[in-house]
């Protein structure tokens, strides 16, 4: 179960599938969150120069480290606020999106991720359905309408 990585030692390349998102906020639909962290750590432990993510531009290890650092930070920040009794909405509002992460697209995915983390932390304050997640995203002003002129912003040629 889960995602597949393709490691090509001779070329010092790893293909990450949906484990890595570069230039856009990553999203995890089901946990546990710790598996995502472990998968990123596994990728970064490989003897590679090139990481080909499932979403976004091709990067070196620094780009992969950036994503790993973000998902660890997001978990830690969500846990602090969960333990303090904050709501899902207030938690998302309070988490500082630092540079260069603040330039990433798909910021609305923070709600999905924090909601999953709230479920893992015990469930208090987590919403139950994707429709509920979308309502929180809309309430926080995180859902931007997509226009046809924006095209595909995930680095894939469809």
Which positions does each model-derived feature cover?
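C-terminal regulatory/interaction regions
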Residues: 86-158
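Metallo-beta-lactamase
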Residues: 1-80
